[in-house]
Amino acid sequence: VLDAATKAVFQSWGPGRYDAYFNHDGKNAPVLIPPAYGLRDVALETYTGEGPISYWNSYVAVTQMHGQGSFNDPRLGINIVAQPDRVTPKLPVLRDYQLTLEPPQPPAGSFDPIAAERGRVVFNGSGRCASCHIPPTYTDAPLLHAPAETGSDPVLAGRGTTGRYRTTPLRGAWQHPPYFHDGSAATLADVVAHYNTTLLLGLTAQQQADLVQFLKSL
């Protein structure tokens, strides 16, 4: 049974957000739940790259859902042993299923194809997007990046085990605003504007608009 204070914290998160570390460190800093699709061939599937998706499935099942299973991560100081372990044997087939989930295709008419082609040039060139969001997965995982590299909020990275963020894959990005792990960018235009300012890209308004159309096409 939840006490009133804990219940109030949970209710404060709102739809689409979750704090998987709250019951570990007691801090209230929920993040957006990332998409479960488009993870095939992506080396690290979580924001902070602690491990493969089976690691995260195990963490959530045991530490969050209180499933009867074992979970051990010395980096977090967690060592839960259950007998019998009803979680670990299920992880491989769950991962296999998750990796079959394809990103949704953009609806017809939802982007300007001519502008998107111009945006592709910006993406691969002056926008420097492809230096980290490398096609066809649009990530450079297993590389991880310090928050300061991209002007990202450092809170989640500091609560995890790596202190860094993976590069989020972009396929299906049109479908899940807001953006960044903390939801600080309401639209893809806001994402582009953030990087244009943070990385001193010097993109024109037209280049930024074209880049948004390309992102909508993925």
Model-derived regions, located:
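Periplasmic c-type cytochrome electron-transfer domains
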Residues: 1-218
